[in-house]
Amino acid sequence: MLKKSLVLMSVAAAFYAQAQDVSVIRNTVDAYSSTPMVGSAKFNAMAGSNGALGGDASSLLTNPAGLGVAISGEISGTLSVSGNKNTSAWAGSSINYSKTNTDLGNVGGVLTFPLMTETGWKFINVGVNYSNQSLDNYVESPGNSNLIYDFDTNKSSSLSGHAYNRYGYLSKTSFGVGANYNHSVYVGAGLNFFNASIDQYDTAAFNSLQNGSTEYFSKQNTPYFERSSGFSATLGVIGKLNPNFRIGAAIETPTFWTIDRNYNFYNDANLGDDMAYEGRRFTSPLKATVSAAFVASKNFSLNVDYTLGLTKPKYRVDGGAETELNDFFKDNYKNLSEVRIGGEYRIKQFRVRGGYSFVSSPFDALTISRFNDAGTSSVDQSYNNLILNNRNLLSFGLGYDFKSFYVDASYQNITSKYSNPFLRGVLNGNTDSAYYSPSNIVTSDSYAVSDVKNSRNNFFLTFGWKF
């Protein structure tokens, strides 16, 4: 049975559980605090690791000083095919869901301007880069026939399943300038313009024990639909220590987001069920990247990037919801940490590339009240992988250079495992996070928690021209 009494939890977890939809927290980190890292097939094959190498428009995704490394103009376009598979398991059952999207993942170009001067400045280059990735993600968790909700004395239903369903995209358009000083120091700056579209659903399904019919419930304030724009700026530098070793550093300001949000609400004392609009302002974390590269010869190069978030996500406070979100991130968010390693080996006109990246879990351990797998009682449990977790990426690619024209292909496998909380919803004088159907309400003081394995398989094909 879904219990009607509050259970003891840690202060931070209880505060978080009372106020906010899990999907809002996930999207704050997964969409608004991240950068689309879909570059050229070469960039993607090296796991996005090029902070001390540079040389093309994808440098604007990591270190704009990389524009200054280019000595010839270039334009390229990249087709991306992204596959996303979620396997959600709970109480001995599991559900798989896969989806594939085909998009124009990246377009980039660099114009080089040699400086015929007697100073050490050799080039000033300008670049533009467009990066786009799908945010589509469907996580359907199994039901549990032991989780029974009594709507009244003559009507009871068991949980038949739950789904977080997100549709959308995240894009980043960057304009930058890079300069080359004596082929040993490179500096650059960029302006970045973001756009995001998110349609988010949070739905539970219950089967009637009387007639077997299925009733669907939407969480309060869902579905919601966000159309957002943001901007940031980037500064970077690359220096050659000697012909074989380079170091780089870049800093990206927070992304300042404007979020236009429409959402469904239910059971309002005056308006009943309807849709409302609100505007939000959000600031993502400030990020810094340091890089080192080893260039053994014209045929082999290896690069390592380390990115660290220096601040935490923060909403402009327009009401209680933003205050509670900010308090949650202040207490529980761990600063972003990402390592990227990539290498390239050239055999005449043929290129072989590979890479690896690791992104750390964004949250400290959280304690919540959850139903046991039998669905018969609630227990307090601490999770170090709740909502989101570590992410591992492996990549490789091939390329062929036809002198002025080139073709590159790459593959990425991205994996993550996390605990997925759902179903909790309370209804009292100050808080309404319950689930609603046209005729019934579901409240629960505890979460159901499924184990999710996410695997993404991405393919990229780039056609480019150097001039």
Name these PLM-found stretches:
Residues 16-17, 76, 205:
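Residues in and immediately flanking transmembrane alpha helices
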Residues 25-50, 68-85:
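Transmembrane beta-strand segments of Gram-negative outer membrane beta-barrel proteins
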Residues 13-14, 73, 350, 405:
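Alpha-helical transmembrane segments and their juxtamembrane interfaces
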Residues 49-50, 56-57, 284:
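Short hydrophobic/aromatic segments of transmembrane alpha-helices and their interfaces
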Residues 1-24, 463, 467:
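Bacterial Sec-dependent N-terminal signal peptides
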Residues 53-62, 68-140, 168-171:
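Outer-membrane beta-barrel translocator/receptor signature
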Residues 20-44, 112-467:
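Outer-membrane beta-barrel porins/channels
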